[in-house]
C-alpha cells in the first residue's frame, strides 16, 4: 500500500530502483540516519516501519524484491519550463545522476529516471529546507543540499518537469475517463 501507484497517502514507488540504492536507504532508515526527523513525517513513518526488519537478510530480500520489479507508469503532475529545467539539470544534476538520469553507482548516486515526479519535487524541497539529510554522516545529502543552493522552488519544478518528460523510462499513465456508452 505505501509504495505503489495507488493514489492515496503513500510513499514513492520503489519498483525498478537499483538493489544497491534500496539496500543503502533501508540501512539508513534502520540505523536512524533517515527517518528520525519529526518534521519529515513520511520518513518518520518509514523509520518506524523499519523496526519490523530484523536482519540484514530481510533487508537484502526487500531490496532485491523491489529492484527486480519494472518501474511503474504514473500520472505526471509536475508542470514547468522544460528548457529551463534541462539547463539546470545539465549544470546541477547530470554530473552525479547521469545525462539520462540513470544514476552512477560508483559514486552512490541513484537514478532519477524511474521515480515519480511528485516525489522528486518533494525530495528537492526537503533537501533544500533541511528536512532530508540532516545526519552529519550523510555525504550524499550534503552534496544534494549544496547542488540545490541558489535555486528557487520554480527551478525545482522546471528540473522535475524536464526529468519526467525527457528522461523517465516509464510511459505516462493516462487518466482514465468515464466509460464510453
Task: Tell me what each language-model feature is.
Residues 1-7, 78-102, 175-181:
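Sequence/structural segment immediately N-terminal to covalent heme-attachment motifs in c-type
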Residues 2, 17, 49, 96-99, ...:
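Small disulfide-bonded, cysteine-rich extracellular recognition modules and tandem repeats
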Residues 8-11, 15, 19-24, 86-90, ...:
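Sequence context surrounding c-type heme c attachment/ligation sites in exported
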Residues 8-15, 30-60, 69-70, 74-80, ...:
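Axial heme c-ligation environment in periplasmic c-type cytochrome domains
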Residues 26-28:
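Active-site substrate-binding loop specific to GH73 endo-beta-N-acetylglucosaminidase modules
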Residues 1-2, 96-100, 107, 121, ...:
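Short amphipathic alpha-helical segments, especially helix-boundary/capping motifs
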